[in-house]
Amino acid sequence: MHWTKYIASCALSLSIGAIALAAAGQSTSPPLESKPAANTPISTASQPAAEEWWKHAVLYEIYPRSFQDSDGDGIGDIKGITSRLDYLEELGIDAIWITPMYPSPGIDYGYDISDYTAIDPVYGTMADFDNLVAEAKKHNIRVIMDYVINHTSDQHAWFKESASSRTNPKRDWYIWRDGKAPGQPPNNWQSWFGHSAWTLDPGTNQYYYHYFYTQQPDLNWRNPEVHAAMDGVLDFWMQHGAAGFRIDAVSRLFEDPGLHDDPYLPGFNAYGDRNIEHKYTDNFPEVHDVLKEVRRVVDRYPGNPVLVTEADEPSVEELTKMYGNGDEVQLPMDFQIADVNELSAPRFRGLFNQIENNSAHGQPEYFFSNHDQPRQRDRYGDGEHDDQIAKLMAVLLLATRGTPQMYYGEELGMRTTDPTRIEDVHDPIGKLGWPKEKGRDGERTPMQWNAGAMAGFTTAAKPWLPVPPSAAQYNVETERKDPDSIFNTYKRLLALRKSNAALRDGSYQAVNESDPNVFAFLRRSGDKTVLVALNMSSKSRKVSFKLAAKGVKGTGLTVLYCSPAGAAVSRVKQVELAPFAALIAEVN
């Protein structure tokens, strides 16, 4: 097919997308069900099964400090999120996962919780949260809470009681041990953030264990009272309208009761410690008992609540265990995919194939950016084709089978903007590991709403983190006006995903599996077959797709989405893809 004919096809695809969006109208997710009133007894019997809405949903992670400030203090808040629900609905989002908004000293910016059943005043009030849930429901958007299950803050009332004496009733709610000798911790276990995982409490002359910061003591999940208390946390937020939970650091819940030393590995970490294998503090089988328990609690509520886990497992086999027998979590986050830091067709193909063939036949959950890792634009961009690569990654995220999870600003092409001086660092990781480790501030900068000095995020003279210079070009207001922007690419793809049955819930099948440059696959539902082709190289590629071997009889292609213009597309044996091109086409 020649250039002019391709442009006509591409233009047609945009029209088809617009028609599909209009026809789709509202989100295809089922209407949200009413929550039980607070303090209403909930039957322990399972509720009637609701549609598995999370299989067709697109999740969107919000870091609340950075999304929208409503009161001019330079920090994002709940009212700010509520004010942007129209935007999220316009984009096509079905559910928002909000990172912790609970009261916290802020050592780890919310992941050190001092009260599980309240809202931190910096973000607002419980009334603000209830209003957010109610308004989100009007936009057919669900709200998923962050369930920080492994540890509390050392300022939590539970820990203060536990630390008050060796005989306190809550002493065993945390993990206390004697040192192996005066001035020496019980063993060599290391904190994820460097140095010993044990801190001496001088008042009781025992050490407490913390997988993360000193100020984040681990709960003792071998204590039934801890189970009961944390189940109460789930009940509280379910009764306030939560649609489910993202469970934090789930693989760290249990440790070796025998306190065996972890094996040392070669080299040193960013904090100067000898590297170790976390053999005795990770992935104990009892984790699955806790996940089953959490599932039983949330399943008492209507609306088919969803559980998402931060499960940075070392293999797809370990990740698969998080599904259980359909009685644990529905969506274990796939860090295998997210940790790929290069555009590699063979590597992505291999990982997608593995998770597709998981023995539990569970629903995949994919993401490429979050609040703990550099943004995808910086990890995959080559400095020359960054915008086009961002569009390719949008297709990879939204056209595969599974539940995609976006990170705020990803739809704009936001960059990671690391601090350049230690004096400007907020994240403790950066403070401890500078300059080798810059911390996570760079991926948590304010959402870029417009090209103004504060990017529309705040009216304050100084936001909590600086607005990146890239906000002048990459922002909602500017990109809305450009039909070929990254924002409009996401919007178009989200509409196509909702309107096309094959993309929404069709099967996945890789094709041309020996191609080192083009990652291609089929999505099939009934008599509909869609081909997705992604050129992950900086050179044009001519590709012939041999689909007959996959049971596909059609040889013609109708373009549904293509970027950039310049490919030659008419039949499966005559496809030319420009550098970093992304193509979605129906086979006929």
Predicted regions and their residues:
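C-terminal beta-strand-rich structural cap/linker in extracellular carbohydrate-active enzymes
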Residues: 569-588
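Solvent-exposed beta-hairpin/edge-strand motifs
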Residues: 547-564
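Acidic/aromatic-lined carbohydrate-recognition and catalytic surfaces
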Residues: 26-235, 239, 252-314, 447
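Loop/helix patches that line or flank the sugar-binding groove of alpha-linked glycan CAZymes
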Residues: 54, 258, 262-280, 289-304, ...
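Bacterial N-terminal signal peptides
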Residues: 9-20
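Bacterial N-terminal signal peptides that target proteins for export
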Residues: 1-11
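Core domains of carbohydrate- and sulfate-ester-processing enzymes
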Residues: 160-206, 340, 345-358, 433-468
